[in-house]
Each structure stands twice: as C-alpha cells, then as structure tokens.
Design a protein with these regions (language model features):
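Active-site beta-loop-alpha junctions enriched in small/polar residues
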Residues: 5-11, 30-31, 54-57, 84-87, ...
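Short, well-ordered coil/turn segments that N-cap beta-strands
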Residues: 22, 46-50, 76-78, 106-110, ...
Length: 259
C-alpha cells in the first residue's frame, strides 16, 4: 500500500501520526504561520519520508525558486517538489530544468510534477524526470485539463503502460497529488500489479475537509460535490468532537479504498 498523508488543521496537529504516514508540508505556509512552521520543522527532523510542496495548487503558481531553495535548506525534507505550472507542459519543464541547473543540492531528493494537455506530454514529463534522476514523479488529480478528474490518472497509467512503459530509461516511483473524489483510489487499486507497485505515495486532504463539512465517505466515495474549501485557508478552524469523529471515520474508509 502506498504511503498516505492527509493535510490537517492545527486542531489535529497532536494526532498527526494517527492521520498520516508522513508529513506533507505546504511551502508557502512556512513563512505565514509560525505555529505551522515550528510544528513541521520538528516533524521533518525525524521523518523517514517527507514532502515539502511548492504550493502551486494553493497559490496558482509555485513559490519563487530562491525561496523554495532556502526552505529546502532550512527544513531539510527528504523530498522537495520542483516548481511547476498547472496544465502547462512547456513552462513546467523549463522551470524544472532551471531549478535543477541553478539550485540542485547534492543529497536532496526531488519530486517532479507532470503537467500537460495530452497523455503524450505527461509521458514526456516522466521521461525527462527519469533522465534527470528525479526520485519521484507526481501525477496531479487534474492531470489533463477538462477531463474526468475521477478517472484520468487511472486511464493515463493504463495508456502509459501500454505505450511507454519500460523504454530503457528506468521505472518511475509515482506520487498522486490530491483527488477530486476519493472513489478514484478504488480505480487505482484495480490497476495491474506492476502499476500499483509503482505508486509510492499519495496525499489528499479530502477525508479531513469532507469530515469537517459533514460529508461521509461511503462505499462509492463522495456522493456530494467536492467542497470548495482548501486546507491552507482553514488552518485555524475549530472542530467539534462530532467533526473529529467523522474525519477519522472518513480516514478509515479512505484507507479501505487504497488497501
């Protein structure tokens, strides 16, 4: 089973290790919230696996390269997400190339995010990151714009396996970034055993956010529309015991999709 992380508000910081297998840190929040920064600085000191994200999804664009580099030096995650631009293949590869040429640190492992308009462009991203020896390759939930975000990653992986798998460059380790509906992971779990074995980790705040808004995950995922709330905008939310109970129920259900 892949390693799972669910981003959490401060009210659940003391239960982080019940929620997540590893810390997933939003880079832009480290300079905005001292409590968040202090908590994750301590977490990253002992984590065997950790991700410091460039916050492109939250901000609309990655935090500046120099800032990302400095955060990597200060917080020392095992993996740093290279700068990307949502749904922009050319700029994502230009940004990744610039960062690796100007800021690459020996011993620091990186995650490269695939962006593009077609499966072919996503596959080209994978090939580039493999050639650059980027350790993990991330597939965002909105992999191809205006596609069915519940099925697009499973469809892509099946296409990639049939058309681009094992072309002599090497095999990737995949990270799945976010989700539209957690039921997607039932589809992911139905992939062939080789593809499932390439999925190293995933992150999503879905069980947490749906829990606090009152949505219960069922056998077919989320039947309500995806909440518009983002974890980064709700760090200080206060949670009732009823909300906490539903969050943990959702987390248990989510893991049943993945296992």
């Amino acid at each position: 089973m892949p390693l799972i992380s669910h981003e959490i508000p401060k009210a659940l910081f003391d239960r982080h290790d019940e929620v997540s297998d590893y810390p997933y840190v939003l880079g832009h929040l480290l300079s905005l919230d001292t409590e968040y920064a202090d908590f994750y600085k301590e977490k990253l000191k002992t984590a065997e696996y950790s991700i410091l994200d460039n916050s492109a999804f939250e901000l609309g664009k990655s935090i500046p390269m120099e800032e990302l580099y400095e955060l990597g030096k200060e917080y020392k995650p095992t993996h740093l997400v290279l700068p990307d631009v949502v749904n922009n293949y050319d700029q994502t590869l230009l940004n990744a190339k610039e960062y690796l040429e100007s800021y690459r640190v020996e011993g620091q492992k990186y995650i490269g995010v695939c962006q593009g308009d077609t499966f072919e462009q996503i596959a080209e991203c994978i090939d580039y990151y493999l050639k650059e020896k980027v350790d993990i390759i991330a597939l965002p939930f909105d992999l191809v714009e205006k596609s069915d975000y519940v099925t697009v990653r499973a469809r892509f992986l099946n296409w990639w396996y049939d058309n681009r798998f094992n072309m002599g460059i090497g095999l990737p380790k995949f990270h799945l970034l976010g989700c539209q509906n957690p039921v997607e992971f039932i589809l992911i779990n139905d992939l062939n055993i080789i593809l499932r074995g390439l999925i190293y980790s995933l992150d999503t705040s879905s069980p947490v956010i749906n829990g606090w808004v009152g949505n219960e995950l069922g056998p077919h995922g989320l039947i309500q529309p995806k909440p518009k709330a983002k974890l980064a905008d709700n760090l200080d939310i206060e949670l009732s015991q009823e909300q906490v109970d539903l969050i943990f129920k959702n987390i248990k259900t989510f893991r049943s999709y993945v296992s």
